[in-house]
């Protein structure tokens, strides 16, 4: 039986698009929230809008430009290069407070829409330097939001314990692997589909896809 309403935190990337399809199988009414936080590549926002339109999912684009004023990182500043974190430090692509703020604003929107369910694509496999992708953070924020608004929100994280190979497997199970591969934007250089192939995000995505396709081919023999 399908649940009533849900809100998806949506970026047009592999993970959030996988979650969008996951949510479409479970909710009668679905809304996507897209955040413009001053990211270097506006193509990300357009990609999310295009996918939402193609899938018939109503969406809102919210201006979160203040976040760009508060914190400097490689996703919003041209003069900061993409670098992995060293010695326990966060990578240059970490946007401090992003998931905290996005989920908080998504909850406010969900309340106005009469929705109790909020879906996000964060996962522990992304934790390396990204503290706001941890399960403990999401559960803590879920409690805080319910106390703050006297609501009964449930934040769903379908990918929390999946690696990239398993995320591709989920996409394939839903019949959306090729769509997600071709239409989404994960690349730090702002290139849709398989991307530039060299940035850390593209490499993580491609390695997961290669592992899944090899495993699938082996199982079919």
From Swiss-Prot:
Its EC number is 6.3.4.20. ATP binds at residues 10-20. InterPro entries: QueC (IPR018317), Rossmann-like_a/b/a_fold (IPR014729). Gene3D superfamilies: HUPs. Zn(2+) binds at residues 187, 196, 199, 202. It is an enzyme of class 6 (ligase). Its cofactor is Zn(2+). The keyword Ligase applies. Belongs to the QueC family. This is 7-cyano-7-deazaguanine synthase. It comes from Shouchella clausii (strain KSM-K16). The gene is queC.
